[in-house]
Amino acid sequence: MKKNLCIVVLAGALLSLSACAQKGPVLLEGVKYQVPEGTVTGTANVVVGVSPFKDERGKTTSILGKRTISNSVENDLVVQGTVADLVTAGLKDALKARGVTVKDAPVWDLSAETIKADGMNILIGGEIKTLWVDVVSQPLNVKTSAAVQLRVFAADGAEKKIFRTLVLNSKMERQDVAFSFDTTADALSEALSSALNQLLKDDEFKKKIQ
């Protein structure tokens, strides 16, 4: 009797997943920088210019992941705007959370010869190598994997010289009994935040913004 009941429950869950599956791209909202607990907002006496990140993933600029439902239905997960906008905004938020004055900088090709940092002590730009979340939804078993890789360049505005180049890597995995857009966004937010925090924890970079 219990075995038959389990079969009915699983079949019902599978049918529910299929019936609720939305075809086509789905907007994933709420992906953002998460300020670590205990972060102290300082009073940095520098102005940091943030140039728009370049999306080097080789994917559509608004797509940041995929959801697969019971191996039958797939949805692209998309962001409002572009992934480059998302990362650029995340870096700005990370700096502001630490009391750093942030200024929008023009597009930068990441070479020392083209540094334009008027009114900025530091200029930051970078490339998005990876930013992706995969969600596989099975009845009572949802696996989420998020990965972020960024290459970041930091330049001294006065000297017109790149003083730091870092590759930031982060991965995050979780398993849940039910799918939720909130948990998916949280997983990718955590991976993005972890990557950006590596820059903020870098000793040489910290010296420049203190």
Where are these regions (language model features)?
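Sec-exported extracytoplasmic/periplasmic mature domains
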Residues: 92-100, 196-205
